[in-house]
Amino acid sequence: MQKIVVYVYIYLFVQISVDPVALDGSSQPTENTEKDGLCNACTWRQNTKSSRIEAIKIQILSKLRLEQAPNISRDVIKQLLPKAPPLQELIDQYDVQRDDSSDGSLEDDDYHATTETIITMPTESDFLVQMEGKPKCCFFKFSSKIQYNKVVKAQLWIYLRQVQKPTTVFVQILRLIKPMKDGTRYTGIRSLKLDMNPGNGIWQSIDVKTVLQNWLKQPESNLGIEIKAFDENGRDLAVTFPGPGEDGLNPFLEVRVTDTPKRSRRDFGLDCDEHSTESRCCRYPLTVDFEAFGWDWIIAPKRYKANYCSGECEFVFLQKYPHTHLVHQANPRGSAGPCCTPTKMSPINMLYFNGKEQIIYGKIPAMVVDRCGCS
């Protein structure tokens, strides 16, 4: 229904722009016709921009399968954001936009967003609460988006507090299991020994891909893990439950999953700017600012170039749109006329909090207008 309404508006605008009509039904061109036409075009483009921004907000929530924007304050975000290398890399080296309409970029056919990286923070499980001698950490709940056969990489990141002198640190990651007859409650995942020098604390990553895949295949076996990291004097260096001044130093899981995009068909279109006098269907620049929406739950990008389509699609533009002209010639009565719409769209990468306070790095399809055309 919305598409039909847009088509009607475009059709009416084209008719008014081409042939201004007086109230008595007679055509009355004036010396200001050209100027008025340009003003009308500016007004039309402004309305199109506003509609495009509102549509983008709706599309993002829909494609992320969110009924509403997550209600996460800036203070909470500051506490939840890990001060860790993988997250900082995503933010610092963020590929916000590939605004190159000349190349055959990759894009997905699916409507919903595809997930590439999920950063999961630890929670407390019932099993850990019920245990005697409760372990320090950690239990991770996994998103349904993670399938065991799609996991490319799974890293457990832990932060080790600073040391006062050169020392050797012994790190041990244990997987919790249901108590056996001999009382055993743990099985080893990984042990490592590393040397630390005085200075700031460090982040250490441990490969847990195999364990994660087993958990995904058998969810009931996921009872949590315990993290141990001691120096030569028995001092516990692992930050499992952050203390004062340790916000953002929680352990977390970084999981990367496969994403297999398909190549899109290449076509061509016009590019214009806001000062252009081009009347034909054209792509115009539009920057979407998430901070202006109050969408603090989007970590990156804070803004991106979305672009939009606007302009006329008359049948006289034969050289620019030959296919549309041939269709009209074959069936002149069966077509209401072409409309200016996106003919190629590409995805954006986004780093965001979902409703469960998990950090997701994913790809949202069809969010950038690369080319416009008449169809």
Swiss-Prot record:
The terms describing its cellular component in GO are: extracellular space
Q: What does the UniProt entry say about where the protein is found?
A: Secreted
- From the UniProt record, list the residues forming the propeptide: 24-266
Q: Where is it predominantly found? A: secreted
Q: Name one GO biological process term.
A: negative regulation of myoblast proliferation
Query: Secretion signal: which residues?
Result: 1-23
Give me the disulphide-bonded residues. Answer: 272-282, 281-340, 309-372, 313-374
- Family of the protein in this entry: Belongs to the TGF-beta family.
| Protein's UniProt name | Growth/differentiation factor 8
Biological source species: Coturnix coturnix
The protein's gene is named MSTN
